[in-house]
C-alpha cells in the first residue's frame, strides 16, 4: 500500500537542503501570521497600517454638512508619547512660547491630541513639540511630520505647517500608472540622488532633476528609477541613510508637490519609481529624530546593549513592539499612498535580520541562516511589510539589500519566504573589484566570470549590478577609474592613442554587458557610471572644506562628442534597449528546462567555455553572447557549437561608435556550418572572427 507523500513548504520542495530547517521556516511564517492577527484583529493589514491618517498634523477644511450647516475648519495634531507628562506646540504661531492654548491632552494608550481653530496655524509656519516627562523635557519634531525644514542661518530643523494645494496627478487613474513598464519586462534600474544630480556645485532640486535628468534616463532606456535620500536626514553627507523624519520628503530638494510631479512625469515616460527605504536604523539625534522622544530610550528602539548600532552610530528599531510595527508599516503604505511610489529598496536588511548585524560573520552554510543569531522579530516585520506593500499596490517592487544569502528572502510568503520581489546580487560588484585589482589579464578565466554572474538561487529573482553608489564613494573607485585611473584626464579624447584607456574602455563595456545579460530579474547602475563618470563621490564635509566639487554629475562630459564618455553612454543606451526588448519574462522551452532550473527570464544556456582561449559563449532566448576576454589574441573562424540557423550581429563592443576599433564587419550574416555529428541535435558550427578583448551579441533569425 502506497504511503502518502509528505507535504513540504514550496521553498523546501525546490531546495531539499532546506529540509532540516523546515520547522524554522514554518515557525517564521506562523509568527508573522499570529502577529498580523494580533495587530489587526482580522482586518486587512493595509487598512490597519494607516497611522499617518491619524497621527501628525491634519488640516480639516471648512465644509457644509448634509443639513446645510457650515462647519468651521480646524487643525488636529496627535502624537504617541507614552512617557510624556505634558506636550505643547511651540512655533511661529505663538512666538515659540509655552502656551496653554496649544497644549495637547492625553486620550489614552499613550496618545496625545490637540484641536485648534483654523486661524491658529498657517501654511509655512515653523513649529516643534515641547515634550515634558518626569525629570526632564525637550523640544521634538512630531514623529509623523510630513515636512521638516532647516533654518539657513541657525541650521536648526523644525517641522513646517504645509498646506499647499493638492497635486493633480496626470498618470494616476484608478491604480493605473499611465504608460509605466510592463511587469513582463526585466527591471533596468537607474539609481540616482537628487541633490548631486546637477553639474553645478550645489544641491539640486526635484524640479531640476525632473526637467534635466529624467529625460536622460528615459532616453537611455531604463524602466525604473531608484531614488536615494528621500526621507529627511539632518546630515546631507550621510547619503540619506541616517533618517530623522520618516514621513517627510527631504525639503532640501524642494516641495512635496515637486516630488510628486517628478514621479508623475516618470510614470508618464513608462518608468517605475522606487525609493531607498531606511527601516534598518535611525539617526541618534534627539532634536531632529526619534531618539529619547518621550524621555525614554526605548520608545521606538531596543533598550540596553541592542539600542545602538555598533558600526553605524545610529539607533536600532525594536521590531517586536506593536507600536513600532504600526509606525513602520504605516510608513511603507504612506509613500505609496501619498507619493505614488512603486516600491522600495530596503536598506541594510542583513543588519536587521541578524542580532550581530552580520558583522564579522562568514555565512558559509545553512546553519548560519537559522541559528540563534537570527532576529525573528525583524524577519516578521519584513514579511508584514512586504504584505502591506503588495496589498496596497500588487505590482509594487521590493528589493532586499542583503549580503548573507539567506534563503527565502525573495520568495512568496505563502511558500515559506519573506516576500521580497528581488534581492541585490551584492557579490557581483565585490567580484569585479577583486578581479580588476588582483588578477592579471592573462589569468581572467571566462568560465569563472560566467559562473560568478550566474551563481544564485534561481527561484529567487535578483538585481545584478557591476557597481552602485557604494563603489563610487570617497575612498573607493568606480570600475572605469580602477581600469584607467589618471590617464582619464589626459587621454579620454578622440584622437588619443593610449593602451590603458583602450583596455579600460573595452573592459568597461564587457563587464557591464556580461553583468546585464546574465540577470535573473533585473540590472542596476548608478547615475553617471553608465558613461564612466570620473572620480569618486565626496559630499560636503569639514575635511574637504564643505565643497560640492565631488558631489555632482558632470553631464557636459557625456554631451561632448569628442570625449569617450559619449561613446560609453551610446553603448549603454544600445545595450539596455536591446536587453529590454529580448529579456522578457516567459516560460522556458523544453531545452531550457533541461539545462537550467528557474522560472523568471529566458534561461542562460552556455555553449562554449574555453579556458585556454578565454572565450565564453551563451544564449538567452534568441540572443547569442560571445565574449573574448583575451587581451592578446584575436581569433579568426572561431567555432562555437550552437542551434543551427542564421545569425545577425545586433551589438558589438568593438564597434567604432562605442570607441572600439571596428575590426569586424557587423553587416555580414552568419550561418551555422553543417556537422553530421551534431545535426541530429539541431546544432551546427558558427564560425566567428573574435577581436581581442571584445564581445558580440547576435540574434538568431527565424
Predicted regions and their residues:
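C-terminal beta-strand-rich structural cap/linker in extracellular carbohydrate-active enzymes
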Residues: 123-125, 666-702
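The feature marks proteins involved in alpha-glucan
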Residues: 1-74, 106-191, 196, 201, ...
Amino acid at each position: 500500500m502506497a504511503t502518502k507523500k509528505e507535504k513540504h513548504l514550496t521553498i523546501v520542495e525546490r531546495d531539499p537542503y532546506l529540509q532540516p530547517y523546515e520547522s524554522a521556516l514554518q515557525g517564521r511564517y506562523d509568527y508573522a501570521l499570529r502577529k498580523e492577527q494580533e495587530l489587526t484583529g482580522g482586518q486587512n493589514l493595509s487598512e490597519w497600517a494607516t497611522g499617518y491618517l491619524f497621527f501628525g498634523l491634519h488640516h480639516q477644511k471648512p465644509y457644509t454638512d448634509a443639513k446645510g450647516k457650515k462647519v468651521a475648519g480646524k487643525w488636529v495634531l496627535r502624537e504617541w508619547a507614552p512617557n510624556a507628562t505634558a506636550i505643547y506646540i511651540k512655533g511661529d504661531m505663538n512666538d515659540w512660547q509655552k502656551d496653554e492654548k496649544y497644549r495637547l491632552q492625553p486620550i489614552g494608550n499613550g496618545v496625545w491630541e490637540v484641536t485648534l481653530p483654523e486661524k491658529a496655524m498657517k501654511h509655512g509656519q515653523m513649529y516643534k513639540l515641547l515634550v515634558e516627562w518626569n525629570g526632564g523635557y525637550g523640544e521634538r519634531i512630531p514623529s509623523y511630520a510630513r515636512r521638516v525644514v532647516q533654518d539657513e542661518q541657525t541650521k536648526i530643523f523644525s517641522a513646517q505647517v504645509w498646506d499647499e494645494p493638492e497635486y493633480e496627478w496626470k498618470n494616476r487613474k484608478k491604480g493605473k500608472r499611465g504608460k509605466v513598464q510592463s511587469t513582463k519586462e526585466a527591471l533596468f534600474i537607474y539609481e540616482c540622488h537628487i541633490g548631486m544630480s546637477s553639474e553645478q556645485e550645489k544641491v539640486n532640486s526635484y524640479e531640476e532633476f525632473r526637467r534635466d535628468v529624467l529625460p536622460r534616463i528615459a532616453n537611455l532606456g531604463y524602466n525604473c528609477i531608484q531614488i536615494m535620500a528621500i526621507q529627511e536626514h539632518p546630515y546631507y553627507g550621510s547619503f540619506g541613510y541616517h533618517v530623522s523624519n520618516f514621513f517627510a520628503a527631504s525639503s532640501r530638494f524642494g516641495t512635496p508637490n515637486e516630488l510628486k510631479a517628478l514621479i508623475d512625469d516618470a510614470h508618464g515616460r513608462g518608468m517605475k519609481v522606487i525609493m531607498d527605504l531606511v527601516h534598518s536604523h535611525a539617526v541618534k539625534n534627539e532634536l531632529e529624530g526619534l531618539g529619547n522622544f518621550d524621555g525614554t530610550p526605548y520608545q521606538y528602539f531596543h533598550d540596553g546593549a541592542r539600542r545602538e548600532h555598533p558600526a553605524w552610530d545610529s539607533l536600532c528599531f525594536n521590531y517586536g513592539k506593536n507600536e513600532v510595527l504600526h509606525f513602520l508599516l504605516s510608513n511603507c503604505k504612506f509613500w505609496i499612498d501619498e507619493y505614488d511610489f512603486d516600491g522600495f529598496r530596503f536598506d541594510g536588511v542583513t543588519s536587521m535580520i541578524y542580532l550581530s548585524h552580520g558583522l564579522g560573520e562568514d555565512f558559509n552554510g545553512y546553519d548560519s541562516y537559522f541559528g540563534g543569531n537570527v532576529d525573528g522579530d525583524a524577519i516578521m516585520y519584513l514579511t508584514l511589510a512586504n504584505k502591506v506593500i503588495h496589498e496596497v499596490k500588487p505590482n509594487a517592487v521590493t528589493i532586499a539589500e542583503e549580503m548573507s544569502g539567506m534563503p527565502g528572502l525573495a520568495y512568496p510568503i505563502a511558500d515559506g519566504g519573506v516576500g521580497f520581489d528581488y534581492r541585490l546580487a551584492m557579490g557581483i560588484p565585490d567580484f569585479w573589484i577583486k578581479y580588476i585589482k588582483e588578477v592579471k589579464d592573462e589569468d581572467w578565466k571566462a568560465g569563472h566570470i560566467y559562473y560568478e554572474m550566474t551563481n544564485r538561487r534561481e527561484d529567487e529573482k535578483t538585481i545584478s549590478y557591476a557597481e552602485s553608489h557604494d563603489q563610487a564613494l570617497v575612498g573607493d573607485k568606480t570600475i572605469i577609474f580602477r581600469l584607467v585611473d589618471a590617464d582619464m584626464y589626459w587621454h579620454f579624447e578622440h584622437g588619443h592613442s593610449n593602451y590603458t584607456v583602450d583596455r579600460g574602455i573595452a573592459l568597461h563595456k564587457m563587464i557591464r554587458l556580461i553583468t546585464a545579460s546574465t540577470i535573473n530579474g533585473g540590472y542596476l547602475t548608478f547615475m553617471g557610471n553608465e558613461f564612466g563618470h570620473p572620480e569618486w563621490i565626496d559630499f560636503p564635509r569639514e575635511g574637504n572644506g564643505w565643497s560640492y566639487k565631488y558631489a555632482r554629475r558632470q553631464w557636459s562630459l557625456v554631451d561632448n562628442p569628442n570625449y569617450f564618455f559619449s561613446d560609453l553612454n551610446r553603448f549603454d543606451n544600445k545595450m539596455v534597449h536591446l536587453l529590454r526588448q529580448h529579456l522578457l519574462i516567459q516560460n522556458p522551452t523544453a531545452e531550457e528546462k533541461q539545462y537550467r532550473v528557474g522560472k523568471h527570464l529566458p534561461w542562460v544556456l552556455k555553449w562554449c567555455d574555453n579556458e585556454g582561449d578565454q572565450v565564453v559563449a551563451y544564449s538567452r532566448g534568441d540572443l547569442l553572447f560571445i565574449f573574448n576576454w583575451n587581451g592578446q589574441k584575436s581569433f579568426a573562424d572561431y567555432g562555437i557549437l550552437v542551434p543551427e540557423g542564421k545569425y545577425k550581429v545586433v551589438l558589438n563592443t568593438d564597434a567604432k561608435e562605442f570607441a572600439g576599433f571596428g575590426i569586424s564587419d557587423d553587416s555580414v550574416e552568419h550561418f551555422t556550418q553543417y556537422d553530421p555529428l551534431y545535426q541530429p541535435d539541431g546544432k551546427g558550427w558558427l564560425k566567428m572572427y573574435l577581436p581581442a578583448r571584445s564581445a558580440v551579441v547576435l540574434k538568431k533569425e527565424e
